[in-house]
C-alpha cells in the first residue's frame, strides 16, 4: 500500500482575485502569493485553513493546460495532490495500479521547483504527485 500524504486540493477558478477574496471570507489565509507557471500557462495561489491547503489555479490563456477544464466544469475542485518521499517508485506503483500520466514529471514553480506529475485514473479522476520536502 502506498503511504502518500495529501499536500493540497487543486481548485480551478476563472478569476483569481475574486476567488482569493471569497476564500479569505471563509477564513482561509494566503500561504503563498500568486505565482505564474510559464510551462502550464496558469496562475497559482496557495491558501490554508485549519491545516488544509488549497491551490487556486487560473488559466492565463486559451492554450493553458486547464483552460478546457475550466470551460467544461467552471469553478470547481479538480485534483488532489499527494506528497511522496520516493517519487520514482511511487510513480511506477501508481502506473501499475491503473493511473495514467498526463504529462512527464516537470518542475513546478509554485512548489519551489519540485518535480510534479499529473495522472488520471478511470475510477478516481486526476491526481498530482509531488516530491516531499515542500
Which residues does each predicted region cover?
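Vicinal oxygen chelate
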Residues: 1-2, 5-15, 34-36, 43-50, 54-55, 67-89, 93, ...
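Long, hydrophobic N-terminal alpha-helical segment
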Residues: 1-40
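Residues that cap or initiate secondary-structure elements
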Residues: 17, 53, 62, 86-88, ...
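A short, acidic/glycine-rich surface segment
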Residues: 32-33, 63-68
